[in-house]
Regions:
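A short hydrophobic beta-strand segment most commonly corresponding to one strand
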Residues: 60, 104-124
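Beta-strand residues in well-ordered beta-sheet regions across diverse protein folds
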Residues: 39, 51, 63, 71, ...
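Conserved hydrophobic/aromatic beta-strand scaffold that supports enzyme active sites
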Residues: 38-42, 60, 81, 89-91
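Histidine-centered metal-chelating micro-motifs
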Residues: 48-50, 69, 88-99
Length: 145
């Protein structure tokens, strides 16, 4: 027990590369089981993710470097575009349709719930180009760590 009366000590986890991605690199910085995770995302200029939403994952992005074009549903079925710059924050709760495109090489910090493999692609709903990339996952494929 520490002097503050708790059986708790700081942890200093090692970063772990999730592996190279088509769009750049994803590095898992910290994973607190059943609570949250933090990642570093390096996204190459011109890279574009699929138009998607998450069933369970709640995520926040902080733009550290570069400019990112975000497309999102305004809640009325319309896709809106917004440019995020260093210091800007984007919050994507479960069900929020969104797509990212790197206008420059980007470095982003992502904090989110621990729902890996939670992705529903929805380009066809909005009549936009279907990109290559990771497909929709089923609810059974979502992994919570």
């Amino acid at each position: 027990m520490n002097k503050a009366g708790f059986n708790s000590t700081p942890e200093f986890p090692k970063s772990e590369s999730v592996g190279p991605r088509e769009w750049g690199e994803e590095i898992l910085v910290s994973l607190v089981p059943e609570k949250f995770m933090m990642k570093k995302l390096y996204i190459n200029k011109g890279s574009k993710g699929g138009l998607q939403y998450h069933r369970k994952k709640d995520e926040v992005h902080v733009i550290i470097k570069g400019r990112m074009l975000i497309k999102y549903d305004d809640g009325n079925g319309n896709l809106i575009e917004k440019i995020l710059e260093p210091g800007d924050v984007g919050h994507y709760p479960p069900g929020a349709v969104h797509q990212e495109e790197a206008l420059e090489d980007c470095f982003i910090i992502e904090a989110s719930t621990n729902h890996f493999n939670d992705r529903v692609r929805c380009e066809e709903l909005y009549g936009v180009e279907v990109l290559d990339g990771l497909p929709t996952t089923t609810e059974e494929e979502i992994v919570e760590k």
